[in-house]
Amino acid sequence: MPSISTNIILAFITALLGMLIFRSHLMSSLLCLEGMMLSMFILSTLTILSLHFTTSFMMPILLLVFAACEAAVGLALLVTVSNTYGLDYIQNLNLLQC
């Protein structure tokens, strides 16, 4: 396994561990989730380019679209929780009702 792929996989694992360790605040969870998506994007792009998968060139772009949607929904939840309760704890998400 090349060192670049190893570093990207380690970045994904680090972001996953950050997601598991710092799960009390919504902002830190969103940052770790963005780190995971960024490392998945880079790894999928490098894999497609190195293996010459011509039919899969749109997969990293699709992954970026889902990452942008996830970020928008996450920031909307962060603003809603912050305006309602003044804190960004994840446990406050259980109190939100439509």
From Swiss-Prot:
Could you tell me which InterPro entries the record lists for this protein? NADH_UbQ_OxRdtase_chain4L/K (IPR001133), NUOK/Mnh_C1-like (IPR039428)
GO cellular component terms, alphabetically, are: mitochondrial inner membrane; respiratory chain complex I
Organism of provenance? Prolemur simus (Greater bamboo lemur)
Q: Tell me the name of the encoding gene.
A: MT-ND4L
What domain of life? Answer: Eukaryota
The entry lists its GO molecular-function terms as: NADH dehydrogenase (ubiquinone) activity
Per the UniProt record, the lineage of the source organism begins with: Eukaryota, Metazoa, Chordata, Craniata, Vertebrata
Q: Which GO terms describe its biological process?
A: ATP synthesis coupled electron transport
Report what the protein is called.
NADH-ubiquinone oxidoreductase chain 4L
From the Swiss-Prot or TrEMBL record, state where the protein is found. Mitochondrion inner membrane
Keywords tagged on the record = Electron transport, Membrane, Mitochondrion, Mitochondrion inner membrane, NAD, Respiratory chain, Translocase, Transmembrane, Transmembrane helix, Transport, Ubiquinone
